[in-house]
């Protein structure tokens, strides 16, 4: 876990680029290799699928990999929560990953399946010393409030997850307090302003989060490098949201807009 959550400050900046496993090509991540290359230097770890790891990450780069191993559904299917484990522990070892990631859907039709998936994955990982990150995915019918997220995070930890990724909410400190393993926050959908995403990161850390696993709010920004630098200044540099936003604005004045933004116009 020390490769995921830095022991110097017990925090992490994880870059999420696993969205294609259910969303397909997405603005900002249409060409994963291009997106990842520009941001790699500023992330503590990458969360991605084995397909993107094989095709889009330079194997010479030494960065901790959080491998998404749950899937089997898509945005056009009937129920995103009907996920299975889609990669073996042997494959994870071959790919030299640092951590395994899997979604759970507490309260959904497939709650039992995804929770037993988590238990099985923890058992698989324990045999080889590979920790597991549980993602508390939220279905359309579920509220992102502290009661629900606190329940989901606690269950994930009780099932053996070593770290939990969840959403920020009101009374988030209660969610963290009730979870005996580190909690990192998801960035979620792209917010309208970079300042909002930076405030989200800052508030979560103030309420006890151990870091962020952010994707769309970084690589869907017109200035993704400046954005990840600003996020990093909050997580590891103890900047507040205003200081981080000023750093973002300064960087965006000299950063060339991302190619995906140019292509889409």
Where in the sequence are the language-model features?
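C-terminal helical cap(s) of enzyme catalytic domains, especially alpha/beta-barrels
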Residues: 205, 220-259
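N-terminal basic/disordered segments at the start of proteins
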Residues: 1-6
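Catalytic grooves of carbohydrate-active enzymes
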Residues: 217
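Flexible glycine/acidic-rich beta-alpha junction loops that bind and position SAM and/or redox cofactors
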Residues: 141, 172-175, 249-262
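Alpha/beta enzyme core
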Residues: 7-185, 191-214, 233, 241-243
